[in-house]
């Protein structure tokens, strides 16, 4: 099970690195929101906002977030939608 979880984490990180233009472990919050709405699971805006509130620190002054921290929190404590 541990290998499967680690593989999923690494897969998520590799996908999000595509948005990491500065190659510093951050991406624009707006790009993460777009990726979540456009790819994978069918999430609506409200679900994405819930996900961000539960799994992420606020964005910095330029709109960037550290995506590895987001993925770690999401995988350690999945968000359940009502």
From Swiss-Prot:
This is Myosin light chain alkali. InterPro entries: CALM/Myosin/TropC-like, EF-hand-dom_pair, EF_hand_dom. One of its GO terms (cellular component) is muscle myosin complex. The keyword Metal-binding does not apply. It holds the Pfam family EF-hand_7. GO terms for molecular function: calcium ion binding. Myosin is a hexamer of 2 heavy chains and 4 light chains. The keyword Repeat applies. The lineage of its organism: Eukaryota, Metazoa, Ecdysozoa, Arthropoda, Hexapoda. Residues 7-42 form the EF-hand domain. Keywords: Motor protein, Muscle protein, Myosin, Repeat. One of its GO terms (biological process) is mesoderm development. SUPFAM superfamilies: EF-hand (SSF47473).
């Amino acid at each position: 099970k541990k290998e499967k979880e680690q593989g999923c984490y690494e897969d998520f990180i590799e996908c999000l690195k595509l948005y990491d233009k500065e190659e510093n472990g951050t991406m624009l919050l707006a790009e993460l929101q777009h990726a979540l709405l456009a790819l994978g699971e069918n999430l609506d805006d409200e679900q994405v906002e819930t996900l961000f509130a539960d799994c992420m620190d606020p964005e910095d002054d330029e709109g960037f977030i550290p995506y590895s921290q987001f993925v770690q929190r999401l995988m350690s404590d999945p968000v359940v939608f009502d």
